[in-house]
């Protein structure tokens, strides 16, 4: 049991280093952690380390939870549980929005830099998985082409697949992009989003939200989602909204998938755009005139 006590101390230390919690929050966070982890008490341990991500500590906690029968040792069960653990050291949504706006007052880039770091520190963006992705550039007659192989989505465990088939049907949240995902605990067939924090945006007078993609296909891959669950539809408003977003975040790009099945976006049921801080081959390509 002393090992899990030390893991709790390590996570509290990490959370304070990354600014997820303040020293005044430590006792409160520790009590939440012992409840989630099924531990009766907390005995602080001295910790002197600097970690890039919480993954090493979370792996210790997950192994311990599986050994004690708290969770089944599958990818989905571990992902659901480590998200619940990290929520114990997360700021509330209103605190994140307030901090984002304070940084935005200095500069939009400072705000997104802070928000992206938060998304990694919270393990919402699983950096250790993202780092496995393979990317390279290939020279073609049309210019350098970016090629990526995304390996950040883990393989499904047969036990998780079986559980998902038996899971009770639910229409809440309506889809993976709905704002109701913020704080949602997840289930066998829906990922946990307890560490998910949205940034409200006003695009052309309508309520939209900013978030980062947890799978990150390119640098600072963000999603701009409609506050309402309405289907994707390319129209004049699409380009007006994209232009409005770029006025708010001039250091980002923004674009929309097609509103067509198969060739378009993967979630056509919810209006959204994608953006980020990356220069694609199309932007670097020379123009031709006939």
List the predicted regions and their residue ranges.
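Conserved His + Asp/Glu catalytic blocks
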Residues: 233, 251-254, 260-266, 277-290
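A short secondary-structure junction signal
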Residues: 222-223, 234-237, 285
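Active-site microenvironments that recognize anionic phosphate/pyrophosphate groups
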Residues: 1-224, 228-231
């Amino acid at each position: 049991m002393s090992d899990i006590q030390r893991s709790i101390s390590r996570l509290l230390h990490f959370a304070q280093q990354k600014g997820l919690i303040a020293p005044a929050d430590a006792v409160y966070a520790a009590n939440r952690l012992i409840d989630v982890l099924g531990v009766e008490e907390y005995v602080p341990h001295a910790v002197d380390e600097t970690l890039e991500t919480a993954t090493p500590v979370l792996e210790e906690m997950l192994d311990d939870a599986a050994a004690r029968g708290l969770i089944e040792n599958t990818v989905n069960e571990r992902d659901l549980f480590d998200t619940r653990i990290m929520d114990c050291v997360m700021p509330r949504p209103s605190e994140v929005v307030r901090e984002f706006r304070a940084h935005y007052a200095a500069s939009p880039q400072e705000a997104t830099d802070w928000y992206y770091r938060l998304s990694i520190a919270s393990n919402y963006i699983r950096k250790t998985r993202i780092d496995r992705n393979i990317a390279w550039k290939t020279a073609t007659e049309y210019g350098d082409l970016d090629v990526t192989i995304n390996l950040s989505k883990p393989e499904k465990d047969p036990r998780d697949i079986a559980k998902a088939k038996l899971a009770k049907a639910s229409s809440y949240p309506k889809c993976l992009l709905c704002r109701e995902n913020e704080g949602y605990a997840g289930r066998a067939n829906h990922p946990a989003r307890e560490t998910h924090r949205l940034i409200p945006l006003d695009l052309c007078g309508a309520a939209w939200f900013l978030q980062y993609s947890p799978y990150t296909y390119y640098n600072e891959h963000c999603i701009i989602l409609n506050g309402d669950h309405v289907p994707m539809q390319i129209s004049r408003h699409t380009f007006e909204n994209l232009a409005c977003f770029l006025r708010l975040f001039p250091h980002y790009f923004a674009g929309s998938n097609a509103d067509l099945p198969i060739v378009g976006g993967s979630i056509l049921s919810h209006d959204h755009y994608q953006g980020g801080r990356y220069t694609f081959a199309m932007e670097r390509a020379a123009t031709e005139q006939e």
